[in-house]
Amino acid sequence: MIAELRALEPTQLEDFTNSLVDQVVAAVTDKIPHLESSLAVAELTVALHYVLNTPEDVLVWDVGHQAYLHKALTGRMDELANMRKPGGISGFLSRAESSYDFFGAGHASTSISALTGVCLADQIAKRTRHRVAVIGDGSLTGGQSFEALNHLGTLGADVLVIINDNEGSIDPTVGALHNEQSYGTYMQSLGWHYTFLEQGNDVRALVDALQQVLAQPGPQTLHIKTKRPDLSPPKSYKPGTTFQWWAAETVAAIFESTSDIQILSPAMFAGSGFAPLRERYADRLIDTGINEAHTVTTAAGIAAAGGRPWVHIYSTFLQRAFDQIIHDIALQQLPVVFLVDRAGLVGSDGPTHHGVFDADFLMNIPGVTVWSPRNGNELQGMLLEVAARPVAGPLFIRYPKARTEGGTPTDFCTHEWLKKSDGSSLWVSTGALSDLMKNGVNHLHLAQNWPFFDGFGTILSDFEEIHVFEESTGLGGLAGAVKALMAELDHPGKCITHKLPLEFIEHGPRLQLLREHGFNTFL
């Protein structure tokens, strides 16, 4: 399809783009917000592949969620129907899929840094080619993009950064950069030439603009305005069916009875279920932009000033603030509550978004407490507990992107026997995995993963064989902590761990992935 595109006259590009859009819309039935983002840059996608000699020229898409037409143009049209499904292609960019996917992505604000690396490598190799990054105005709020602009602007390399400005990402864009004047002033202050194009959905205008800026030496920015179609109804959660619904409903009740709790989120309120509360509680639900590190240290500042900050953040994005958790919060023992959404396997978003690493790294930080509810009511009990009794240090409440039936309303308790009888074998599990499992002869659910509750070691001593189950990967976490405790107690028994493998797990339905990666016997 690329060869067909490049053989066209400029006057034929609009019809070609419209036909391509129709084919992609007919093929894609999943993740409609990402389809909307892809359609917003339909004309840009066609113009880029028309003007550039990809894959020899470098084209980097930030995040990659907007690359559905890019995939279609580069030989994957027939695979779009199975995108994000088991065995199908990724919903993001993947170097394993195509040479046209120069740099894999899934998280925001990385594209300009990647392009900086390309420029440095090309300097050493004395290689001349076009180098282009496409970044949305939402991703441009991320600190890494500013760091990269600052560095790349000093290299004097021939490079183009295209700012796709549709005034939103998952949530509406926040921050002081909000119009062509502020963008232009900022870019020029960092040594970048700046060009603005209002007609970002006009393929002919885009081709002309690209040809002009690519002919200019040095670092160039092309700021285009685009419009994203609205194809999906407002997101809602059926009452009582998901952890996100339980979190949002409980927070709404807490806000009714308290006035001092503030919740910060790095541009993820739309997926949290909290979005309907933002109009009523604008001063207490604070969108910080795609800035995980900044978000966490801001929460630390609120806590240091005597406030009560909570941070809503996806597990996969918590990784981006690891240093701030240690240096700014844990080291100072500041009372910050983290609502770690999407903990565990997340399904069709795949390896860039699975929340399978945080449990291991959190439990290695001094002074940290980690909770993992098994159902909606337990999550509710946890949130009500921390609202009623302020925490003494950092607390992380991990919950998955999953369905839950709720369970029996209860006050928070650190552990619960799901089944107890005779036998020398003990199952220890945590989180939503506890509710999925067929109960063993003795099955103990740990709502508090860490630190262990008083008396846990005594319970372990009553059993000869300990099975530990957790929906995470790596060598630490709950399983590592149980093994360490057994060694400390000189426990003579055997500890058998059931974890996800130490690998990047592909996309697919959560239950299917669990069954395929070691849990089939127990679910």
Name the predicted role of every residue range:
Residues F317-Q324:
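Glycine-rich anion/phosphate-binding loops
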Residues M1-A27, Y186, S232-S236:
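Cofactor-/ligand-binding subdomain signature composed of acidic, glycine-rich
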Residues R284-T295, P309:
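Active-site cofactor/substrate anionic-group-binding motifs, chiefly glycine-
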Residues L44-Y50, L115-Q123, V159-V161, V251, ...:
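Proline/glycine-anchored alpha-helix kink/cap motifs
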Residues G136-T141, T241-T242, N291, I313-T316:
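Short, glycine-rich nucleotide/cofactor-binding loops
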Residues P33-L155, I261, F274-A275:
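Cofactor-binding active-site loop characterized by glycine-rich and histidine/acidic residues
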Residues S372-P390:
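Conserved glycine-bearing catalytic or ligand-binding loops at nucleotide- and phosphate-handling centers
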